[in-house]
Amino acid sequence: AISDIGTCEADPEASYFANVQIPMYLANACKDNNRKLICFSSDQVYSACEDDGSYTEENVKPGNIYAAHKLEMEKRVLDILPSAVMLRAEWMYDYYEKRSNYLMMILNAIHTQDSVSFCSKQFRGITYLKEVAENMDKVILLPGGAYNFGSETTQSIYEVTNKFLDMLGKKLIVKDALARHNLWMDCSKVRKYGVEFSSVIDGLERCARDYKL
């Protein structure tokens, strides 16, 4: 997949091949060989919803090419293979230095004492990658369809960031960014099948404890 929104906007053809056509090839292969298919979709399918959320699986409105391609991928794959599972994943993080994610952004900013910017009005989930891995045995057993998948929150990403810094005992300037659309998912559908995540702030606390941050 190509998950960078800017890259997809700049090259829609490459985005379509990576984010729609390749999953369709996989769906056909799984159909021919009687295999289960799990695809990662994205919370970006809610990026232009008119209400504030939290969003259930039926309430979709993509606001960029990446999101539109992910939603089309879901529909096309499920047409080919109704048993396939589409996981609408959030921004995932872990202690991994080779690729930027929320955790590494905060830790790097603490190290350099650069400021970070998050919107006090934006509600979105972020998910500890370890909890994603821990849930995969249950994901394999899910009925076909689309599922919101990740940690839930009752706080803005700005509030979460300040609480996380307090938890770490670190000082950092957190600027209030311009308003951004919520990516705030209701994950109750998947929870009915035993797929459980910590809340956003509890997931960050667990990650900090795991890595002794």
Language-model segments: residues:
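Residue-level signal for the nucleotide or nucleotide-sugar donor/cofactor binding architecture
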Residues: 10, 18, 64, 124-127, ...
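NAD(P)H-binding glycine-rich loop region in Rossmannoid oxidoreductase-like domains
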Residues: 1-18, 31
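Catalytic helix-loop patch of NAD(P)-dependent Rossmann-fold dehydrogenases
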Residues: 10-13, 17, 21-25, 45-87, ...
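Mid/C-terminal beta-alpha module of Rossmann-like enzyme folds, strongest
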Residues: 133-182, 186-187
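The catalytic Tyr-centered alpha-helix of NAD(P)H-dependent dehydrogenases
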Residues: 62-69, 99, 121, 128
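NAD(P)-dependent short-chain dehydrogenase/reductase
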Residues: 75-124, 131
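C-terminal amphipathic/interface module of NAD(P)-dependent oxidoreductases
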Residues: 171-173, 177-213
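A short helix->loop->beta-strand "cap" motif at the edges of active sites that frequently abuts
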Residues: 32-36
